[in-house]
Amino acid sequence: AKEEKENREGIGDTVWEDLLKECNVKKYPAGSRKQAYKDQKRSYQVFAKVSGQSYEEFIGALGQTDEDIQSSADDQVKARMTAKTIAIKEGLTLSDADYERFLLAFLEPEEEEDKTLKAMEKRYIEEQSCYPRDDMLIELVKEYLGKNSKMK
């Protein structure tokens, strides 16, 4: 059962990635692009600090430029827009239980870490993005795609 679940998750991820390649965004909401860029940059700054490097050293070591970070931020906005569209069309709603489940799975908190929803949300916002619910909706859509795609 666990193996089948992991296989379905992998299928959901694959279908999601293929789907995103086919999606074209006509116009990005300006505020969303700016916030996604700030979130992406902050995330890199957190990792840089943890690794004892400056932000510039860290992204340089990854072979990334500021333009790459903007492109990655645009991809995140596209993913959120796509997930919201699929959720509306398919009647999917992110329940509080699913939200918490996806958030915990994403963050993989340490044993001694505070695992309350409020603490996990705070950590996600500090380390990842200001849009934890939107990002966990992506996980719900991936799960849905994995469960509902036809295996070849």
Model-identified regions with their sequence ranges:
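Extended, charged alpha-helical "arm"/coiled-coil substrate-binding scaffolds
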Residues: 1-152
